[in-house]
UniProtKB/Swiss-Prot annotation:
Organism phylogeny: Bacteria, Pseudomonadati, Pseudomonadota, Gammaproteobacteria, Moraxellales
Name of protein: DNA-directed RNA polymerase subunit beta
Cellular-component GO terms for this entry: DNA-directed RNA polymerase complex
Keywords on record: DNA-directed RNA polymerase, Nucleotidyltransferase, Transcription, Transferase
Originating gene: rpoB
EC numbers: 2.7.7.6
Role this protein plays: DNA-dependent RNA polymerase catalyzes the transcription of DNA into RNA using the four ribonucleoside triphosphates as substrates.
The species this protein was found in: Acinetobacter baumannii (strain ATCC 17978 / DSM 105126 / CIP 53.77 / LMG 1025 / NCDC KC755 / 5377)
Gene Ontology molecular function terms on file: DNA binding; DNA-directed RNA polymerase activity; ribonucleoside binding
GO biological process: DNA-templated transcription
Family to which the UniProt record says this protein belongs: Belongs to the RNA polymerase beta chain family.
InterPro entries: DNA-dir_RNA_pol_bsu_ext_1_sf, DNA-dir_RNA_pol_bsu_external_1, DNA-dir_RNA_pol_su2, DNA-dir_RNAP_su2_dom, DNA-dir_RNAP_su2_hyb_sf, RNA_pol_bsu_bac, RNA_pol_bsu_CS, RNA_pol_bsu_protrusion
Superkingdom in the source lineage: Bacteria
């Protein structure tokens, strides 16, 4: 087994017992793949499929003029290069986007002959399309955003009922709904009287037969579509019907049924059963004589014409009178509809009878009246409206998904055409579609078939970034189309080009609106790598076209059987969004139709294969799926007599031969965040939910520390999140410093004609969206060999390429003087001293100089009425120095604003300009450090409007950036030269010279000779071998090209820096100051474990006072044991024990290293740990002695262990490891009180738990106010920290003071401390003078009350 660079350094022992069938997939694929398919950027225009952007263009173009003489056709689109890269966009506050150009063809036809008269082709600029970064995010206006995927109801047809809630009788009313991808909804529904109604777009209901009439069917045709006929014969005064025994089953016999010999088969009043049916068939009965009463209330199936020409219409109810008419009219035979009360209800016939419309025209008018109330209906308007509703591809689109679901639900073949034409035809409804839906609805009402479960994942699909952007793009294009159509008629006469016709602004506006302000375009949660990944893998049922929090019921939010392996049953927010926002399971992916799929191994005849098949919830119906941990022998046969399986959403046991599939992994059920919780299987689900949510709030600590007890998913998350630097190609580390890594690439991975050098620039101390610090640290050394995919540098919260959200803490579960009451946490001062829970937060503060009506604001160090001391940290331009340590109230950027007292005349302006009387007419509006903030300035950026002169500081920053870039490029070229020189020496070594350079013809080129020459001289040598001479020429050409490319890069960078910045209107200059704030842990900060065990730090004790063991090792944290039993998250106890074993083993390894034991002894001990305690076996023999020593050195702090979710370490294994580490098998330790040295009464559970510091820091929440801003109307202090507000003294607090009888305190609260304007000014003066006298006046809110009463017309004094 081959280990990667980081794995060699620190192998994580895995306790998993199940074989790894497939690796966890790339975790961001749902975002990246979706947008890639949308853009199809890498493909040539000819090879582009009809999806994404291409489909959007194809669906709107060609655009024809109203006359049909001019048309615009779409040819192809191309995306340019973005102007700035991702980092520059974040810095400048711009959008990372590429310009899009579309080739459009204008065709003009001759008016008379309609032949093509003119064709013009032109590229049209269509605005910018935001590009996705490598990590699945978008940079919009300088901030990283994520487009969350939406889980919405799939288009198609759905049958449902109201569960008896609509009508007071409790009768179940059935309904059907056809939902298109875009267009009008069509609903059919029953009412309490069993008539069928139709609604279009949820408007007023009409009888369903109105729509059938509008489709062109008459009464007879409608009845034929829904009912079978029964012929009735009139023979010698009695009626006979054809006997179909099967139809009679279940009915009550209304008369005796006899055979041909008169023997009674069924007596009157008895129910006809299967035995009776068999007897009738045996007796050979073909006709049945029926009394007249039997035919009463039956329905005629067609128009019946009597002898005298009178017509009895179809759908007439038979009665005595009608029967007499038929007999007199000489009708010998007629058809009635086959209906009964059991499974052939007469619903459609009854509806048709209630329908007052007589023909198609009337039906269309009825529909028009509902859709356009108040407008006078005309025949054409009604016809057009109805056709446009469901039969026009412009207005209605079922989409391939909708058509597939529709056909599948109605039991038709569901292959969907892929070409544009068939997609248009299948996208609209046909007459048969509407009739089949109605027929199925009636069948369900008759008791055949089931209603749909709308929460089934086969009826909900995922709309990802690409699809949502495509929809927005289409919206923009349709707006363009409207405008273009009107202009096209001009194009025929005015000789216009495509550029003149198309205005791309609506497209750009639609895209901008979507990315900037859509509910699903969210500010990325960038607390740590896990929160980024989780945010990108989120699926939301909210958003446009989705649910709203208020309307979503319990069923939608609940866990559904189809969530298994597709959506995580654990990870969802607490609060109003619970169950509406979910996370994808680890192995889940969306298929082409947008349905979530999960992988399974195929099982054939009880034998498990390694073939993996992805199944959606629709395809999973009917399969029998065994669990991942089912017992299997070495040949893959299921060994149990009855296997525990899932079938039709139920957990049952079945014999192995019936099993069709098997889970690929035990982690398949849960999401990424939940799969990072060790011993998840021992935690209550509610606590696991809190645990997975709180891991996302963990703040990256100063030094990341890998978890001793992990799950094995840590490396996957760190790699896929994109925060680490990963080697694109293998090679040797040529150069490394804190901000750059250079790799000389392996020969076999190089592309012909390149120097084979990869340069990786690291991100240093950058601000994240949540103000945490993003910083990358190198983990490779000079000369190290790395392979493709190896981790070169750690990002925030990663340690050796593994996710490391918190710190391993030595915890004791015991009480300590009430300091861990109610989940409080007692910390040791050692944690503070070692900076283990210290984090760096970076704040961005902006100062904007605007052009005001009174003149321009100015950024300057010349500020009126400010002392020298306050300006000591500013430079001549008035901007703070980098490295300055600042506290609350310090000036960061000096800015003065013109005062608005007097409007100056031009003469006065001139005098002021000459004599510089600044102080009089400007006020200080400098940027100061906000209250409660203290930190170090780490960066300053100055942006100046294009056309304005840059100040000294801006020029200095620009120069520094250019110098740094020039240095980078020089070093880059130097590395290329070095690499080229080595290659040249390698090529020339041992060759014969043909002269050139300092060599003579026939010289043998030795290594000593060559290594003494410079590259220039080397390249002048002409070797005898022509192939090598050719190679040298190639290298020379390459270096020239590289040099030119570097010069070009530098010129481009210089141009970018020299041009002014695009600032919003009225803004002249923006200065951004970045403050780094160091936050140590302190009482009031929130901490948590990974099992939902959260608490607030109550006290930080000196190390010497903490409880310690017999060896004098103090604990870091004391937790309350009462926090475990009632919460049922026992996983934390198992983690603590296993953590103790991991640390104990690390201590033993450290002891061995100190005693300088032999490598062989080390190998043996490591072998015991990795290969003798169960779990996955490690190939330690493949490591060299040096690598074993390096590995042992990295294991000193503890041996990292992985206990995968649902496949983790067993109790016996934990005990074995504890024993191997020479620790008691109970996991409990005798502790002593640090203050008295006395032993505690009983042994205490002590071990190592991974604790996180959450982004709920007391520094951000603590806030105090004496005086400040007041509300305009009520004059009461504002609320909240952001407004520098006060604490609300509400109604209940007033009651408390009343209860104590504290009258003066109460008066003070309600007047001078609140809204008594004069009183508070007076008391402020008094306190300043040292006189604490209070003189309360009238509160302003009382004045407001009197004003409101007066506004009602009641005078009050």
């Amino acid at each position: 087994m081959a280990y990667s660079y980081t794995e060699k350094k620190r192998i994580r022992k895995n306790f998993g017992k199940l074989p790894q069938v497939m690796d966890a997939p790339y975790l961001l694929s749902i975002q990246v793949d979706s947008y890639r398919t949308f853009l199809q950027d890498g493909k040539s225009p000819k090879n582009r499929e009809d999806i994404g952007l291409q489909a959007a263009f194809r669906s709107v173009f060609p655009i024809e003029s109203y006359s049909g003489n001019a048309a615009l056709e779409f040819v192809e689109y191309s995306l340019g290069k973005p102007e700035f890269d991702v980092r520059e966009c974040i810095l400048r506050g711009s959008t990372y986007a590429a310009p899009m150009r579309v080739k459009i063809r204008l065709i003009i036809k001759d008016r008379e002959t309609k032949s093509i008269k003119d064709v013009r082709e032109q590229e049209v600029y269509m605005g910018e399309i935001p590009l996705m970064t490598e990590n699945g995010t978008f940079v919009i206006n300088g901030t990283e955003r994520v487009i969350v995927s939406q889980l919405h109801r799939s288009p198609g047809v759905f049958f449902d009922h109201d569960k008896g809630k609509t009508h007071s009788s409790g009768k179940v009313l059935y309904s059907a709904r056809i939902i298109p991808y875009r267009g009008s909804w069509l609903d059919f529904e029953f009412d309490a009287k069993d008539l069928v109604y139709v609604r279009i777009d949820r408007r007023r209901k009409l009888l369903a037969t109105v729509v059938l009439r509008a489709l062109g069917y008459n009464n007879e045709q409608i009845l034929n579509l829904f009912y079978e006929k029964v012929p009735v014969y009139l023979d010698m005064g009695s009626y006979q019907i054809d006997l179909v025994p099967e139809r009679l089953r279940g009915e009550m016999a209304q008369f005796d049924i006899t055979d041909n010999e008169g023997k009674v088969i069924v007596e009157q009043g008895k129910r006809i059963n299967a035995r009776h049916v068999r007897q009738m068939e045996a007796a050979g009965l073909t006709k049945l004589s029926v009394p007249d009463e039997y035919l009463y209330e039956r329905i005629t199936a067609e128009d019946i014409t009597l002898r005298d020409g009178e017509v009895i219409a179809a759908n007439t109810l038979l009665s005595h009178e009608v029967m007499v008419k038929l007999a007199e009219g000489g009708v010998k035979q007629f058809n009635i509809l086959f209906t009964n009360d059991i499974d052939r209800g007469s619903f459609v016939a009854d509806t048709l009878r209630a329908d007052l419309t007589r023909d198609r025209e009337e039906a269309l008018v009825e529909i028009y009246k509902v859709m356009r109330p108040g407008e006078p209906p005309t025949k054409e308007a009604a016809e057009n409206l109805f056709n446009n509703l469901f039969f026009s591809s412009e207005r209605y689109d079922l989409s391939p998904v909708g058509r597939m679901k529709f056909n599948r639900r109605l039991g038709r073949p569901y292959e969907v055409g892929t070409d544009q034409k068939s997609r248009e035809v299948e996208g609209i409804l046909s007459h048969e579609d509407i009739i089949d839906v109605l027929r199925t609805l009636v069948e369900i009402r008759n008791g055949k078939g089931e209603v749909d479960d709308i929460d089934h994942l086969g009826n909900r699909r995922v709309r990802s970034v690409g699809e949502m952007t495509e929809n927005q793009f289409r919206v923009g294009l349709v707006r363009v189309e409207r405008a273009v159509k009107e202009r096209l008629s001009q194009a025929e006469t005015d000789n216009l080009s495509p550029q003149d016709l198309i205005n791309a602004k609506p497209v750009a506006a639609a895209i901008k609106e979507f990315f900037g302000s859509s509910q699903l375009s969210q500010f990325m949660d960038q607390n740590n790598p896990l929160s980024e990944i989780t945010h990108k893998r989120r699926v939301s049922a909210l958003g446009p076209g989705g649910l709203t929090r208020e309307r979503a019921g319990f069923e939608v939010r609940d866990v559904h059987q189809t969530h298994y392996g597709r959506v995580c049953p654990i990870e969802t927010p607490e609060g109003p969004n619970i169950g509406l926002i979910n996370s994808l399971s680890v192995y889940a992916k969306a298929n082409d139709f947008g349905f979530l799929e999960t992988p399974y191994r195929k099982v054939i005849d009880g034998r498990v294969t390694d073939d993996v098949e992805y199944l959606s919830a629709i395809e999973e119906v009917g399969t029998v799926i065994a669990q991942a941990d089912s017992a299997v022998d070495k040949d893959g046969n299921l060994t149990e007599e009855f296997v525990s399986v899932r079938h039709q959403g139920e957990f049952v046991r079945m014999p192995p031969e019936k099993v069709t599939h098997m889970d690929v992994s035990a982690q398949q059920v849960v999401s990424v965040a939940a799969s990072l919780i060790p011993f998840l299987e021992h935690d209550d689900a509610n606590r696991a939910l809190m645990g997975s949510n709180m891991q996302r709030q963990a703040v990256p600590t100063l030094r990341a520390d890998k978890p001793l007890v992990g799950t094995g998913m840590e490396a996957n998350v760190a790699r896929d999140s994109g925060v680490c630097v990963i080697a694109n190609r293998g090679g040797v580390i040529e150069y490394v410093d804190a901000s750059r890594i250079v790799i000389r690439v392996n020969e076999d991975e190089m592309v012909a004609g390149e120097a084979g050098v990869d340069i990786y620039n690291l991100i240093k101390y950058t601000r994240s969206n949540q103000n945490t610090c993003i910083n990358q640290n190198v983990i490779v050394n000079l000369g190290d060999k790395v392979a493709r995919g190896d981790i070169l540098a750690d990002g925030p919260s990663t340690d050796m390429g593994e996710l490391a959200l918190g710190q391993n803490m030595r915890v004791a579960f015991m009480t300590w003087n009430g300091y861990n009451y109610e989940d409080s946490i007692l910390l040791s001062e050692r944690v503070l001293q070692e900076d283990r829970l210290t984090s760096i937060h970076i704040q961005e503060l902006s100062c904007v100089a605007r052009d005001t009506k009174l003149g321009a604001e100015e950024i300057t160090a010349d500020i009126p009425n400010v002392g020298e001391a306050a300006l000591s940290k500013l430079d001549e331009s008035g901007i703070v120095y980098i490295g300055a340590e600042v506290t609350a109230g310090d000036i960061l950027v000096g800015k003065v604003t013109p005062k608005g007292e007097t409007q100056l005349t031009p003469e006065e302006k001139l005098l002021r300009a000459i004599f510089g009387e600044k102080a009089a007419d400007v006020k200080d509006s400098s940027l100061r450090v906000p209250s409660g903030t203290k930190g170090t300035v780490i960066d300053v950026q100055v942006f100046t409007r294009d056309g304005l002169e840059k100040d000294d500081r801006a020029l200095a920053i620009e120069k520094a950036q250019l110098d740094s870039y020039r240095k980078d490029l020089k070093e880059e070229y130097k590395i290329f030269e070095e690499a080229a020189r080595e290659r040249v020496i390698r090529l020339l070594k041992g060759q014969e010279s043909n002269g050139g350079g300092s060599t003579k013809r026939g010289d043998k080129l030795s290594e000593d000779l060559l290594s003494g020459l410079e590259l220039v001289d080397l390249l002048e040598i002409q070797p005898a071998d022509e192939a090598i001479a050719e190679r040298l020429t190639q290298i020379q050409v390459f270096l020239k090209e590289k040099s030119a490319e570097i010069d070009e890069k530098f010129a481009e960078k210089k141009r970018k820096l020299a041009t002014g910045d695009e600032l919003t209107t009225g803004v002249l200059k923006v200065v951004k100051v970045y403050l780094a704030v160091k936050r140590r842990i302190q009482p009031g900060d929130k901490m948590a474990g990974r099992h939902g065990n959260k608490g607030v730090v109550s006290n930080i004790l000196p190390v010497e006072d903490m409880p310690h063991d017999a060896n004098g090792v103090p604990v870091d944290i004391v937790l309350n044991p009462l926090g475990v039993p009632s919460r049922m998250n026992v996983g934390q106890i198992l983690e603590t024990h296993l953590g103790m074993a991991a640390k104990g083993l690390g201590d033993k390894i450290e002891k061995m290293l100190k005693e300088q034991r032999t490598v062989l002894e080390l190998r043996e001990f490591l072998d015991k740990i990795y290969n003798k305690v169960g779990g996955e076996q490690e190939d330690l023999d493949s490591l060299t002695d040096e690598e074993i020593l390096a590995l042992a050195g990295n294991l000193r702090a503890g041996v990292p262990l992985a206990t995968p979710v649902f496949d983790g370490a067993e109790e016996s294994q934990i005990k074995d490891l504890l024993e191997l580490a020479d620790i008691s098998r109970t996991g409990q330790t005798v502790l002593f009180d640090g203050r008295t040295g006395e032993q505690f009464d009983r042994p205490v559970t002590v071990g190592y738990m991974y604790m996180l510091k959450l982004n709920h820091l007391v520094d951000d929440k603590m806030h105090a106010r004496s005086t400040g801003s007041y509300s305009l109307v009520t004059q009461q202090p504002l609320g909240g920290k952001a407004q520098f507000g006060g604490q609300r003294f509400g109604e209940m607090e007033v009651w408390a003071l009343e209860a104590y009888g504290a009258a003066y305190t109460l008066q003070e609260m309600l007047t001078v401390k609140s809204d008594d304007v004069e009183g508070r000014t007076r008391i402020y003066k008094n306190i300043v003078d040292g006189n604490h006298y209070m003189d309360p006046g009238m509160p302003e809110s009382f004045n407001v009350l009197t004003k409101e009463i007066r506004s009602l017309g009641i005078n009050i004094d």
